């Protein structure tokens, strides 16, 4: 059932698509994207990453008749009460990654040292057309720099410094970023679950 299984990546974010394809490569699945279908995605109205990922994955699975994998992820700055959180992609109503980074730096201009600690969280939901769904999560701790560093990645990557690596996500290649990142950890949890075939449904079912 596994090798060659068709799975739709339920995201229009090119950066996420790149990282998901790289991370899922060992499974040998045939990965399709939203560009292969004429779909209008639902609004993300969930209060949590899990709710949003489930909403997207279940919608695409039902619409296409194929398993769908959605990623909902974001940055949580502790001193800002967890902002931007589920609003990471539309923080402050800003339209571009650069504008959102500038807005975040402005919100944090009074914060120093330990006050700049943050974490990235990712929740992957794999939903099937029959209604079954599974969730895989990952997170990584870091610090928000006072100015961007690096040219790679997307989103808040130029600001998110990983002390363990001594770099921002934007200073890492895909492979190195996957070793440390929230999305990489969630993907490894999924790979582990599927290494011997699909996990038992009674264990992995999302209620």
Curated annotation (Swiss-Prot):
Pfam families in UniProt: Ham1p_like
NADP found in the keyword field: no
GO cellular component: cytosol
Catalytic reaction annotation: XTP + H2O = XMP + diphosphate + H(+); dITP + H2O = dIMP + diphosphate + H(+); ITP + H2O = IMP + diphosphate + H(+)
Cofactor binding note from Swiss-Prot or TrEMBL: Binds 1 Mg(2+) ion per subunit.
Enzyme Commission code: 3.6.1.66
Binding positions (substrate): 11-16, 73, 154-157, 177, 182-183
Active-site residues per Swiss-Prot or TrEMBL entry: 72
Named cofactor requirement(s): Mg(2+)
Biological processes per GO annotation: nucleotide metabolic process; purine nucleoside triphosphate catabolic process
Stored Gene3D superfamilies: 3.90.950.10
Enzyme class: hydrolase
NCBIfam families (UniProt xref): RdgB/HAM1 family non-canonical purine NTP pyrophosphatase
Protein purpose: Pyrophosphatase that catalyzes the hydrolysis of nucleoside triphosphates to their monophosphate derivatives, with a high preference for the non-canonical purine nucleotides XTP (xanthosine triphosphate), dITP (deoxyinosine triphosphate) and ITP. Seems to function as a house-cleaning enzyme that removes non-canonical purine nucleotides from the nucleotide pool, thus preventing their incorporation into DNA/RNA and avoiding chromosomal lesions.
Protein name: dITP/XTP pyrophosphatase
Organism: Thermus thermophilus (strain ATCC 27634 / DSM 579 / HB8)
């Amino acid at each position: 059932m596994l090798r060659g299984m068709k799975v739709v990546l339920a995201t229009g974010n090119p950066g996420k698509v790149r990282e998901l394809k790289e991370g899922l490569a060992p499974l040998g699945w045939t990965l399709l994207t939203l560009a292969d279908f004429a779909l209008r995605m639902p609004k993300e109205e969930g209060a949590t990453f899990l709710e949003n990922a489930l909403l997207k994955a279940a919608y695409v699975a039902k619409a296409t008749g194929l398993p769908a994998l959605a990623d909902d992820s974001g940055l949580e700055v502790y001193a800002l009460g967890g902002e931007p959180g589920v609003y990471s992609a539309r923080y402050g109503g800003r339209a571009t990654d650069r504008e959102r980074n500038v807005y975040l730096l402005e919100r944090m201009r009074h914060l120093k040292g330990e006050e700049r600690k943050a974490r990235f969280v990712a929740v992957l939901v794999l939903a099937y057309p029959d209604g079954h769904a599974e969730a895989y999560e990952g997170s990584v701790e870091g610090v928000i720099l006072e100015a961007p560093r690096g040219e790679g990645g997307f989103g808040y990557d130029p600001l998110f410094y990983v002390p363990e690596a001594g770099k921002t996500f934007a200073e890492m290649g895909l492979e190195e970023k996957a070793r440390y990142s929230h999305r990489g950890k969630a993907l490894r949890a999924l790979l582990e679950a599927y290494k011997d075939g699909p996990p038992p449904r009674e264990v992995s079912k999302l209620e």
